Amino acid sequence: MRFFALFIYRPVATILIAAAITLCGILGFRLLPVAPLPQVDFPVIMVSASLPGASPETMASSVATPLERSLGRIAGVNEMTSSSSLGSTRIILEFNFDRDINGAARDVQAAINAAQSLLPGGMPSRPTYRKANPSDAPIMILTLTSESWSQGKLYDFASTQLAQTIAQIDGVGDVDVGGSSLPAVRVGLNPQALFNQGVSLDEVREAIDSANVRRPQGAIEDSVHRWQIQTNDELKTAAEYQPLIIHYNNGAAVRLGDVASVTDSVQDVRNAGMTNAKPAILLMIRKLPEANIIQTVDGIRAKLPELRAMIPAAIDLQIAQDRSPTIRASLQEVEETLAISVALVILVVFLFLRSGRATLIPAVAVPVSLIGTFAAMYLCGFSLNNLSLMALTIATGFVVDDAIVVLENIARHLEAGMKPLQAALQGTREVGFTVISMSLSLVAVFLPLLLMGGLPGRLLREFAVTLSVAIGISLVVSLTLTPMMCGWMLKSSKPRTQPRKRGVGRLLVALQQGYGTSLKWVLNHTRLVGVVFLGTVALNIWLYIAIPKTFFPEQDTGVLMGGIQADQSISFQAMRGKLQDFMKIIRDDPAVNNVTGFTGGSRVNSGMMFITLKPRGERKETAQQIIDRLRVKLAKEPGARLFLMAVQDIRVGGRQANASYQYTLLSDSLPALREWEPKIRKALSALPQLADVNSDQQDNGAEMNLIYDRDTMSRLGIDVQAANSLLNNTFGQRQISTIYQPMNQYKVVMEVDPRYTQDISALEKMFVINRDGKAIPLSYFAQWRPANAPLSVNHQGLSAASTIAFNLPTGTSLSQATEAINRTMTQLGVPSTVRGSFSGTAQVFQQTMNSQLILIVAAIATVYIVLEILYESYVHPLTILSTLPSAGVGALLALELFNAPFSLIALIGIMLLIGIVKKNAIMMVDFALEAQRSGGLTPEQAIFQACLLRFRPIMMTTLAALFGALPLVLSGGDGSELRQPLGITIVGGLVMSQLLTLYTTPVVYLFFDRLRLRFSRKNSKPVVEI
């Protein structure tokens, strides 16, 4: 009583406290960063190593395995995967959430150093690492095009100057430059000319390496001067290499230009990048795992004027893709939804109270509670994102509930003729405990979410804390500012004044009277209501089992990403043609705004494409509908497939895949994996629940096996090292020397000119110089035959691995897909040597599915414990919790009606309903207990009176919560995929709960009261006088 009076009778102090909360909130709002979702990126580090010309199997055994053994000892590694392809190995380390990325990077460098002695010689550089996830979609793609500059020169400028500058921007984790490679001097040898001159490839390589030397020469010094010695020991251009003498034949000099074509070219000619049908260099920018995407993009955009200033006029720099516009649009939609929710909630209050002054009170209390929450969000290190703003949108209905309960009770006393300050004090005292009970029990719902681990726990933590803080501030405001404003702004009125019977008031009276009549009938037919109540419990269980489930709603971010997978024996020239064909098909689609892509490198038969769609307001279709339309057109392209998927704000796992979900096969026996993977992939491809099924296991690449006759080689004076060196020099694009320039280092690349290696007959023209200096053709000591070989070798941990990726057809949920895969694996009878498990997002979904029921039960148990403490009773909390089954039925039926799967967002809605619908029961039970204690009423009379007295605030709070969530259901535009499931769940649960709990709660109250009396009689013992 004294606590409430302190604020009621000190209006200036109360107003200043509210103003301070508001000002802190405004400051916090201005300082909060912006993001699509809470920070949930796993710390990921990518280790890269190269050995040009080495086969995938060689890279896996000699490079990947030693590194994996060393890296696998690092603490906190959640998952380690590797992929080895032609001349390249990439290892992805995913760490636990609690692992600091910088500390992990230091451990990674130490592990690389420890494995260095086990790595093969001939590697052009030490393994390197980057703090970025290569499977993440780039946050921005820049393109460089030019009519006059070569692709190699553009690539050099991009990688040497632009990429270095961009990498220094806060938040940037990796700048991957694609579309070509660094400039190089390429030496294309003529095997026939070499044979005629008696020059071996090794002799050419040694001559070039010896002629291009960068060594310190020292200085000459006398008593007065010092001269630095400088020589022309370096060759920098093709023109300088051409006259190089590499051999003498009968006293005549053989120059490099006599036996080779020497050109200024690039290190790897098998690379191509394009943007909208034009050759281009791509700068694909990815953020650090812990970085904010909006701040990072803003930093890049702020740097663009400086970048454009340093670019020559012949180069055109454009932004081909930017993830931030759709994120900003989505957040703007949520902010508008929040404003609409506040307006609707205040409208509900006005319609019920029919007073401008009375409506002004919650109109002040709601913004103070919501704005004050921003300060706490800033202190907690949160961001303005879809989930935190959705929490505030839902909180609109919650925070007004507390003000409504206090305001309505004070208004009831004023209508009875009590003076304003006295009514404020008396009304607040009566419902103070009720408001505290509602708020604390609502916050208790979110305690299990705060304790939840893994990605779902990290994802929902901001939502739970934001909502809890808003409720906490609302509780304080409702018990301080609201009664003060009621006491000083509202006026007393005569009992049963006429306005109560006008408009909405008349309707409310009629509803209340009808409710009273129906409630009497219900209380006389409690068994029927009991059957209905038990039926809702059973229906909950059945609906939860039957409803399709997924991890997170499929988002339309306006960006598509596609992986190209072509025939495994395709040439680079043919692959480049496939890239152009696919780009033309996509570019012709009316919903596409921009398309970029690249192919080449270590995986000749693959490529990547990035597609920017037009804004949502300029297209009718969703991203998934566009993918479905394009899939039909793209399937007509022979010899290659393009797998499209919508880029999501949440992507789990470090392994790159051509689809959204992955199922990984592991085995310690590589032959067993290679035997069963095609069978499993074929079976999964036939499932109607899966689309775009593909695998990263590619074992049918064309290979030419050379079999050495070691006896013949020994007789001819040739060793295996010389033969292998011949092949590497001929076909391996061997980097034989380094050209040092002020801004970068470039390579001299040697191979037999591709004109002479167009078919297998090129092997017949190869020869080795033996120990006696004679040229011995390769065919003298080797035979060759075609075979199949893997284009890549993949590991997970230290086991051989193959990942089958898949998308979901329209109308199929992830739960249906995972059940179909598990069923198929059982039917196939896969041996124990091959183990299958979901990975990435599908793995997190499986883990979430296993914990969903536990989380719901934990939330209910937590609420029960809190209510038990507040009411000092085991029975009354059960009465309050009896409202939950009807809400669950309504939520699940609404999801089925709107064809929405049960996702993590819908789970949030269920948790919220646990907190919302019990408020009705709390108001009924509180007043019934008070009536029994102070009024001497029977339980039947008490609960009947409580239901009628609390009918108006129950209707107000329920409608306020319903109208607060309704804009989420009706919202469209960017990000609506996240908002709608939450709104559908809450609205459906509230409607069903309101229809049933007004009748089931009083029946359950009487049932437990009778049960309590019967139990107390059985346990009572007669008193015996002594």
Swiss-Prot record:
Signal peptide limits: none
Gene3D superfamilies from the UniProt entry: Multidrug efflux transporter AcrB pore domain (3.30.70.1440), Multidrug efflux transporter AcrB pore domain like (3.30.70.1320), Multidrug efflux transporter AcrB TolC docking domain, DN and DC subdomains (3.30.2090.10), Multidrug efflux transporter AcrB transmembrane domain (1.20.1640.10)
A single MF term (Gene Ontology): xenobiotic transmembrane transporter activity
Chain segments annotated as transmembrane: 15-35, 333-353, 360-380, 387-407, 431-451, 463-483, 528-548, 853-873, 897-917, 953-973, 984-1004
Protein origin, superkingdom: Bacteria
Membrane topology: Multi-pass membrane protein
Sorted UniProt keywords: Cell inner membrane, Cell membrane, Membrane, Transmembrane, Transmembrane helix, Transport
Any Pfam family the entry gives: ACR_tran
InterPro entries named in the record: AcrB_DN_DC_subdom, Acrflvin-R, Multidrug-R_MdtC
A Gene Ontology cellular-component term: plasma membrane
Localisation: Cell inner membrane
Subunit structure: Part of a tripartite efflux system composed of MdtA, MdtB and MdtC. MdtC forms a heteromultimer with MdtB.
PANTHER family linked: MULTIDRUG RESISTANCE PROTEIN MDTC, PTHR32063
Protein family according to the UniProt entry: Belongs to the resistance-nodulation-cell division (RND) (TC 2.A.6) family. MdtC subfamily.
Protein name: Multidrug resistance protein MdtC
Source organism of this protein record: Salmonella paratyphi A (strain AKU_12601)
Gene name as annotated: mdtC
